[in-house]
Amino acid sequence: MNATEKDLPQLEESFIEEAERIISQYPVSKRSASLPLLHLWQRHFGFVSPQGVQWIAEKLDLEPIAVEEIATFYPMIRQRPLGHYQFKVCRTLSCALAGSYEIFEYIKKSCKTVNEVGHHVYVSEDGKFSVEFVECLAACGNAPVMMLNEEEWMDVTQTKIDAILNHLIREKRKEEF
Amino acid sequence: MAKAEYRLILKHADEPGYTVDIDCYLSHGGYQVLKKALAMPPDQIIQEVKISGLRGRGGAGFPTGVKWGFINHEKNTKPVYLLCNADESEPGTFKDRQIIYKDPHQLIEGMVISAYANRAHLAYIYIRGEFAKGAEILEKALAEARERNFLGKNILGSGYELEIYVFRGAGAYICGEETGLIESLEGKRAYPRIKPPYFPAVLGLYMCPTIVNNVETLCHVKHIVEMGGAEYARIGTPNNTGTRIWCVSGDVNKPGYYEYPCGAITFGELLYEVCGGIRNGNKLKAVIPGGSSAKVLRADKKYKIPKKKEDGSTEIVEMGLEDIPLDFDTVAATGSMSGSGGIIVMDHTRDMVECLRNIAEFYAHESCGQCTPCREGSLWMKKMLDRICTGGGRPEDSKLLLEVANHIAGRTICAFGEACSWPVQSFVEMFGEEFEAKQRKESSLEILEPLTNRTA
């Protein structure tokens, strides 16, 4: 990783302020802010790039490897972009009993997510959609459960998926006009 | 008629019109118990919690008062930290979610009281990353509490100072293990720490005495201070005090969360009356009683339960699964555990080998990779189950599965070793005939619905 200052994306003032606010919550050790800053970076840029790791490391006076090892440990932190709309379907027992594998296949088919980019992770050709299996989302009483980006969806059915996709496509068209 | 719920923790959670706003909480008597607590000496609160018999609701069921008692405040010179474990990562469990999403101030009040009792001035809520909305709700609730002086420098004029922050995890099950949680909060990989020391109360966050309690546990503290430890102990049965929130999922007609005093309801009453019976009129086959790490219980088996008689002696009673009361000790006597209260139900159409394969995949994915038996064993078991389920099973596989599982439990730094081997041990022991039939590739099992329609 040879990221230099000029490779860094232009960071807005508000981003840096938010980073400072987060760091202030860990008065004993700045290092504790590593994961929160990775979350912040990912929320802004969609994934954590080597530049992101570098920036966070500098901010926290750490070696980049100390941030990198966190970024690669936690499943939610991504090192590459995924779809604009990310479906995360729960795979674990209660959801599987309620048909989450069928839901997963249905989303895959409906969104034409044909490229397998990782274990249980699929992205559509145009990069708009991605579908992945995740482990227990702690809403087992409403299985099957999924997340669409950071939003939680309960009691998912194929009809619900159709409605969600129709809505997303309409929204997308509006944006294009 | 199903037995009525006794809602202590979830009293207001589902009331129409009840919101997460602080004004709503205050109009329901919120933060009154905090006022009472701040007028008590901290040791008296610890004493009340001890008297209450409160046991941790995260899974292990360890007495909270005893945990708190590990810190010697007379000798201790280091700062004390309080951590709320809101990772809720045990599959089958969704109770803490109800508290966080619907009644966050109850948790905050419980936390301020607990932090005051333990002389902590800094506390964190470690919330699972997937609860993005929950983290937002908590952040807002904490800001409101700060504004009203329930948090900050001089809480309600008592001179007591406390700050609470939210820390979001990022999808790792192992962060529910308290020392893994601490490592994660320190900005490291969530590798659980070597024991001893057995309790973070000795060495925890930043190598300082730390108390780690589950969300529900901290809420119970509020009610204990409100009603007094002795009064609280009258709810439930001896050594199994208070209420518990049972989360039911799987093959029942009405899955959901139900709060009852410990021991007040049996598996049969819960599944057939409260949850409306098994789906499609099917027969009950198996129950995982306390989150996916708990050993599976077979519905048609008799369990030997020690029962205290009136003269104080103990007799062994044979009980069917449906007659077993839901508490800590009776469920433990079956050889399993009530763990986090996550009850997963499977009916007679379910293929138990497929169910175990699903659980094994979870543990193979979630092993943190620190200890060899767990890292290698969890994946090995998953691969064996994959091949059994896809027609490549070998006659010796169930024996080998047991052998691998037996070599993990007790040989790892944290309890994940047990968590990943108990399901394998219990499924193979309880449903051996299904594994053997599948290994022999007998077709008699084709009537069972496949859990997945994938090809591995």
Give residue ranges: language-model regions:
Chain A
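Signature of N-terminal electron-transfer/Fe-S-associated modules in redox systems
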Residues: M1-F177
